[in-house]
C-alpha cells in the first residue's frame, strides 16, 4: 500500500477503505508519510468530501493514533459535551457541576481560545492555582473520587489530529466538514466518551455561520458517533450575539458562578439548563427531557451545583475562596461604561466583532502560544430585542491599557445596531 495511491483515489472521488485510511493516518503520525503528502490528502478531502463511513473510519484511526482512555472501570457511562465555540460561551463551567451534582460523573478535556472564540481553560485559569494539566492517571482518579474533572487535553490523546490540524491551518483546508467533524469526534472518543452531547453554534460569531452549514456538521458528527458505537446528540444553538452578558476570562467565570448561585443572565441560564438536560438524559439519569431539566434546575436551587464547582476547583488546586467571594477576581485597571447614543430596539450585537475586540484588549490570542489577560473584556447590557433609551448603559469595557480603550469602544459600539421597530429576541436553539 502506498500513500500516493490513496491520495490519487481520493483525488478521483473514490471511496477509501478503512484499511487505507488507517495506513495513511498511522504513517503520517509516525513520520513515514511526509507533510506534503498529508497536505495533498487534506486538499483532496476538502475538494471531494468523504462519505459518513469514510469520516467515521478517519475519526477512529485518529483516535487510535495515541492513547485511548478506557473509563469503564471508573464510571458506569462516560458522558461528554462539546461546544463548537463562540463568544461568551462559558457553558462548560456551569453545566459540568450541574450534571455532576445530579449524580452523573463527568470528565471533560477542554481547549484554549484561538482567534475571536474563547477557551474554557483560559477562563478557569483566572482562578489562581487551578491546574489544567492533569495526567491521564490524575484524570481517572479525580473522576472516580470527586465525580468531576475539567482539564486540558493530554498530549497522548489523538496525536494525529494535532499534526493534521497544524497542516490544515496553513494549507487552506480548515473549512472541510469531514475534517472538522473527525477532528472533534476523535478527541472525544480518545478521551473515553461513550455518550456525547454536541452544541453546534451557528451565526455571526460561529465558525459555521449559516444554519445549513451547522446542520451538515451536526448530522455528520452524529453519524460518526453512531458508526463508532457512541450515543451522540447534536443541538444547534445561536451565536449571532454573545451568550450571556460577559465576554472575557474572569468576567465569564464570575457570570458562570453567579448562574450556579441562581442568578446570571436569563439566556445563559436557559442555555445551560437545556444542555445539562440533554447530558443527563443521554447519561440515563432521567426518563425524559422534562425530568432531566427538573434535575438540572434543582441542582441550582438546592446549591448542590455550586458545591460541586467548589469540589472541582479544590481538587485541581484552585483557590476556592474565589468561588465564595467574586470580588477577589482580578479586575481591570480601567472600567468604562458606554451609553446608548440613541433610543430604540437592539437589532444586532455582532458576536464576532465583540470577540475580536476582546482579543484586541488581550482576552484572547492572535497566535497560538500568546498569553491572555484574565481581567479584560466586556459586559453587554442590552441584547437583541431589548429596548434601550438614549443615555442608558449599553456595555462596559474592562481594559488594562488606556491606549486600547478608544479602539475597543468603537468596535463594540459598531457591533450594536438599532431599530425604531420592535425586534424579536433571537432564539437560543434552532434544533
Label every PLM stretch briefly.
Residues 1-88, 127, 260, 308-319:
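Acidic, glycine/proline-rich low-complexity segments that act as flexible tails and inter-domain linkers
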Residues 3-4, 120, 161-169, 200-202:
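Gly-rich Lys/Arg/Thr-decorated short loops/hinges at beta-loop-alpha junctions or inter-strand turns
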Residues 5, 10, 15-18, 28, ...:
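Well-ordered secondary-structure scaffolds
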Residues 47-48, 94-107, 187-192, 227-228, ...:
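Alpha-helix C-terminal capping segments
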Residues 77-100, 104-116:
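Glycine/serine-rich anion-binding loops at beta->alpha junctions
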Residues 109, 143, 151-154, 199-203, ...:
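Short beta-strand segments
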Residues 123-149, 219-225, 229:
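A glycine-rich helix N-cap at a beta->alpha junction
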Residues 144-193:
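Phosphate/diphosphate-binding glycine-rich loops and adjacent basic-rich segments that engage nucleotide
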